[in-house]
A protein has these predicted regions:
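N-terminal small-domain helix-loop-helix segment of the aminotransferase-like
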Residues: 8-100, 107, 282, 302
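Short, solvent-exposed loop/turn segments at secondary-structure junctions
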Residues: 35-39, 102, 126, 173-175, ...
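Inter-domain helical "communication" segments and dimerization helices
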Residues: 58-59, 282-286, 308-317
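Conserved core of the PLP fold type I
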Residues: 61-198, 202, 208-226, 297
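Conserved core segment of the aminotransferase class I/II
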Residues: 225-295, 307
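Conserved glycine-rich beta-strand-loop-beta hairpin in the small C-terminal domain of fold type I
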Residues: 278, 295-305, 314-319
Length: 319
């Protein structure tokens, strides 16, 4: 049978990231292209223990349908985790458990963009965001990066343009692909511009927990008093990516639209994975686990920088 693929999907390109990952199975190749977390950082024993306990003691809790927002007790555990150092989730914010952060990017575009609308993105930006936004018909407006984050004058020019963007997508902590971290001053300025021009910020934070040097910089969401910031947090780098678990924190009015998008997409996130994550958050010392992950990456980073300095002294890179 000949299938007539829709115009929208014919214009979409396969995920570059997935194509890169295919090459990583080649035993003759050492690839630095994919962002696979270190396998020795996965808490496999804890996951196995909690999974076995759950399936033996309360299998229905893991195997039955659940609400689209996420299991209520899981959402409370995630809210507490997100708020343990700074106030990410406030009274007017909802928490949605999603099937990875990619789903949050997809929902933001679906809920905020019409065909032909503009989305502002850092330039360069995370490749995985491109298809998520373009699948909803969005056009991308790139904003150049500087060493301390996005160029503010360029960002304001995009915000002030006749075709005002529907939102601004950024990764303030260890930006993908540059590795740069947005300064506190620029985060405050980005938030001020967002409020002034009425452009929401989609703050993607998959790497914030992995800081191996220096002090954490407050998230843009922690500054949010107007419901202007959509925060995407992920468990892929601090638990494991195969569980496909992330969480979105945003104003409850927008969250209602995200929940409908969730119902149309996959009904709800894997309940077993949610329950195991809840056990990890409430019954283990997650901060101690994250400290061990940082040690793993600190050693890898030190070796990588040593080799770059020795073998590629002409190369400039983000430390």
């Amino acid at each position: 049978m000949e299938f007539k693929i829709s115009d929208k999907m014919r214009n979409m390109k396969p995920s570059v990231i997935r194509e890169i990952l295919k090459q990583m199975s080649d035993p003759t190749l050492i690839s630095f292209a994919g962002g696979n977390p270190a396998a020795d950082s996965f808490p496999a024993e804890d996951i196995a223990r909690f999974s076995d306990e759950l399936l033996r003691q309360d299998p229905v809790a893991a195997l039955q349908y659940s609400v689209s927002e996420g299991v209520p007790s899981v959402r409370e555990a995630v809210r507490a985790f997100a708020n343990r150092r700074e106030r990410v989730a406030k009274e007017n914010d909802g928490v949605l458990i999603t099937s990875g952060s990619q789903q949050i990017l997809d929902f933001a575009a679906k809920c905020l963009c019409n065909e032909g609308d503009v989305v502002a993105v850092e330039n360069p930006a995370f490749l995985g965001a491109f298809n998520a936004f373009r699948s909803s018909g969005a056009r991308l407006a790139g904003v150049p990066m500087e060493d301390d984050g996005v160029n503010l004058a360029a960002l304001e020019a995009v915000f002030a343009a006749p075709e005002k963007p529907r939102f601004f997508y950024c990764i303030p902590n260890f930006q993908n692909p540059t590795g740069k971290t947005m300064s506190l001053a620029k985060r405050r300025a980005v938030y001020a511009l967002a409020v002034r021009y009425g452009v929401p910020v989609l703050e993607d934070d998959p790497y914030g927990e992995l800081r191996i040097a220096g002090e954490p910089v407050p998230s843009i969401k922690s500054m949010d008093t107007e419901g202007a910031v959509i925060y995407a947090g992920s468990f892929s780098k601090i638990l494991c990516p195969g569980m496909r678990l992330a969480y979105c924190v945003c104003d409850k009015k927008l969250m209602a639209a995200f929940v409908v998008a969730k119902q149309c997409s996959d009904v709800h996130t894997n309940v077993w994975a949610q329950r195991v994550c809840e056990a990890m958050l409430t019954r283990t010392d997650m901060d101690a686990h994250i400290r061990e992950i940082r040690k793993i990456y600190a050693a890898k980073a030190a070796l990588m920088m040593e080799q770059l300095d020795e073998k590629c002294p002409q190369v400039r890179y983000t430390r």
